[in-house]
Amino acid sequence: MVKLSIVLTPQFLSHDQGQLTKELQQHVKSVTCPCEYLRKVINSLAVYRHRETDFGVGVRDHPGQHGKTPSPQKLDNLIIIIIGFLRCYTFNILFCTSCLCVSFLKTIFWSRNGHDGSMDVQQRAWRSNRSRQKGLRSICMHTKKRVSSFRGNKIGLKDVITLRRHVETKVRAKIRKRKVTTKINRHDKINGKRKTARKQKMFQRAQELRRRAEDYHKCKIPPSARKPLCNWVRMAAAEHRHSSGLPYWLYLTAETLKNRMGRQPPPPTQQHSITDNSLSLKTPPECLLTPLPPSVDDNIKECPLAPLPPSPLPPSVDDNLKECLFVPLPPSPLPPSVDDNLKECLFVPLPPSPLPPSVDDNLKTPPLATQEAEVEKPPKPKRWRVDEVEQSPKPKRQREAEAQQLPKPKRRRLSKLRTRHCTQAWAIRINP
């Protein structure tokens, strides 16, 4: 582009004919011009001679004759045409390069329009129909969801990279899935089965869920409901050598348990076996009505629900006691005891018995030394009440003239007054 602008300058046109044709041919080869008219114009410039720098002063009558210059008007027209065409061509080149640069910069820098984590963009992307979702589909970096590229939602370089990684992982997963399916199919061909990787995964998941459910139900059963009486009943059956109808053989289990507790079983009636049996409450009511098959070991030929005859007891000492209970026994004389004398003495009033000496007596009676000290002490003066003490008569009111005639009292010292007052008080207390 720069060399073409130099060609059209008047200094360049004033060169020699051979040098001008060589340089023009080189530029024509280097520039890929879409129009053939431009080549013809440039080749026709080599025919003209430029003797002076101002595009030639002479006038050319015949264009085919040598030694004459063309008219400046035609030369100016040719130069204007070349410059105008090159300007259009340069504008197209600049426009294309600017578009390419802008698109390249858009792919390099991050787009902050649709991938900033805003909820409205995500909702529009997910609520839009599939017919609108045209173009690339990328995974949002913030929400890890697929977002389609619509107007206002640009895809940056980071999203393109994530999309490519997602495609690569998907392809790897497909390849691995094929390998797994071939392995499973080869393994299952021996057993006559054919499973895909998806079915195998579902089967393993179902097994895991089944195991979890079993463990959960096992943990839900309380320890009181984990068959605590079954072992006891089996032990009772082992003693009786009977194991056929264990949970429903009422009287047998009750008898065994009561023998363990040291009690004699009651007569085996139907009502009694249902109400008093401790294990019958835990057996279902349907089991009580169904008769059980007899066993050889027990030698029981009748149904357990039918009342059995009472077995005769062996003769014992209690038989004589039962016969004696009907005859009233004579009162047996009691042996003489100390209580008989006590009953006779109860009618006579007893003298008051002296109390035994205790520690409190010493506290109540002071020792001799304290008694003697109390005797030696002089008796304390008796305190008189306010009513018993003779009240001194109130002084009579005297007139001023009589009061002035009386002699004035002598002034006494404070110490004498205090001693005199104390002696008078003690005299009143001692000699009332």
Swiss-Prot record:
Region Disordered: start-end pairs: 260-280, 353-420
UniProt biased composition (Polar residues): 270-280
Pfam families named among the record's database cross-references: NPIP
Biased amino acid composition, Basic residues: 408-420
InterPro entries named among the record's database cross-references: NPIP, NPIP_N
Compositionally biased region (Basic and acidic residues): 374-402
Entry-linked PANTHER family: NUCLEAR PORE COMPLEX INTERACTING PROTEIN, NUCLEAR PORE COMPLEX-INTERACTING PROTEIN FAMILY MEMBER B15-RELATED
Family: Belongs to the NPIP family.
Protein name: Nuclear pore complex-interacting protein family member B8
UniProt source species: Homo sapiens
